[in-house]
Design a protein with these regions (language model features):
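Helix-enriched interaction subdomains in cytosolic or periplasmic regions
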Residues: 2-31, 114-142
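Positively charged, low-complexity intrinsically disordered leader regions
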Residues: 3-71
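C-terminal helix-to-coil terminal segments
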Residues: 8, 286-321
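Phosphate/diphosphate ligand-binding glycine-rich loop within oxidoreductases
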Residues: 41-43, 47-153, 278-280
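Glycine-rich phosphate/diphosphate-binding loop of Rossmann-like nucleotide-binding domains
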Residues: 59-71, 154-233
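Short, structured coil segments at secondary-structure junctions
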Residues: 76, 106, 126-128, 186, ...
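Rossmann-like adenosine-cofactor binding region
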Residues: 206-284, 289-290
């Protein structure tokens, strides 16, 4: 279906990193996602993507990202074809290049998650249809960042000048890599909480600071709660560790309970890209601060807006009318 003329490779309709979006584009997409909330909830039917096919390619495990993209496409009237490394020719040794050629012919747009950093850009360069990066190893996860920004703005009414605390696996956590770059563009103050072995990579911290970002690094989680507007918890990603003994040393190092939040601002929100292991005790779920389940749902309207953008479909001001 590449003959339809959608732009791939370095084209503007791809989303590989947050650098592919200007601040104005970010805000426009969030506005579109807001208008699409009734569609995501199933209250309004808006077949904006009728006749379009999404190729959903997941070479790593996923629940929320895969399902929310599928829900987003179908609620907008589109169709989805799914591919994973199990049960496809990938298991027979087919190269990523060859797989992407097939997707180019079967779909109008592709979403890819892959364990290799850079795989999303490689795929975008290889085919003509738009490609959305759903996570490339320890690299980037821009569609997660967009739903995170949507959730933050939903709670605070703005993205400007917030105090954001990122906690946990900041070395391998692609969600925090993408989110930190986006937040500093809106003047956020970042506090990076991690054990020394899981610090945010130096090149990322250096890049943030070179753009004038206010970035502090610490291992003290408890001391970072009181001033936070957002606390973004992450799990320690066992699958990224080359040595299980190294994982064991840091597993469970940060655990949030409801009691920890006694010093928090009333409007502070707790986020998590999920799945959680033991970083957030279930006692937090019923507090006014918990936003992680709403955050996960917000993947549907946000990814609706991203699909429409990449396919050149305008989201009307009054959806469903």
């Amino acid at each position: 279906m590449a003959a339809l003329g959608f732009v791939g490779g370095q084209g503007m309709s791809d989303l590989i990193t947050m650098d592919d979006l200007s601040n104005d584009e970010i805000l426009d997409i969030l506005d579109a996602a807001e208008r699409l909330l009734p569609v995501a909830n199933g209250d309004v039917y808006a077949p904006l993507l009728q006749g379009k096919v999404l190729g959903n390619l997941f070479f790593e495990n996923s629940t929320r990202t895969r399902m929310s993209f599928e829900s987003a496409m179908k609620r907008l009237g589109g169709e989805v074809v799914n591919l994973s490394s199990v049960g496809s020719s990938v298991a027979k040794g087919e190269t990523l290049y060859d797989t992407m050629q097939m997707v180019d012919g079967y779909s109008d747009i592709a979403v890819i998650r892959h364990p290799r950093q850079g795989a999303a850009q490689y795929s975008a360069d290889a085919i003509g249809i738009p490609v959305l990066n759903a996570g490339d190893g320890a690299g980037n996860h821009p569609t997660q960042t967009m739903l995170d920004l949507f959730t933050i703005r939903q709670a605070h009414g703005t993205l400007e000048g917030l105090n954001v605390v990122l906690v946990g696996d900041l070395r391998y956590g692609r969600t925090t890599h993408s989110l930190s770059h986006a937040l500093v563009r809106f003047g956020a103050k970042l506090t990076l909480v991690s054990p020394d072995s899981l610090r945010m990579p130096n090149e990322i911290v250096g890049d943030l600071q070179s753009h004038g970002a206010d970035v502090a690094e610490t291992e003290n989680f408890a001391g970072s709660i009181a001033d936070a507007d957002v606390i973004y918890m992450t799990r320690i990603q066992k699958e990224r560790f080359p040595d299980e003994d190294e994982y064991t040393k840091v597993a469970g190092i940060y655990k949030m309970t409801a009691d920890d939040l006694a010093v928090a601002k009333a409007g502070m929100i707790v986020m998590h890209p999920l799945p959680r292991v033991d970083e957030i005790h279930p006692s937090v779920d019923s507090t006014q601060h918990a936003r992680y389940f709403q955050q996960a749902f917000n993947g549907v309207p946000t990814r609706m807006a991203l699909l429409c953008r990449s396919l050149g479909i305008e989201v009307p001001k009054e959806v469903g009318e």
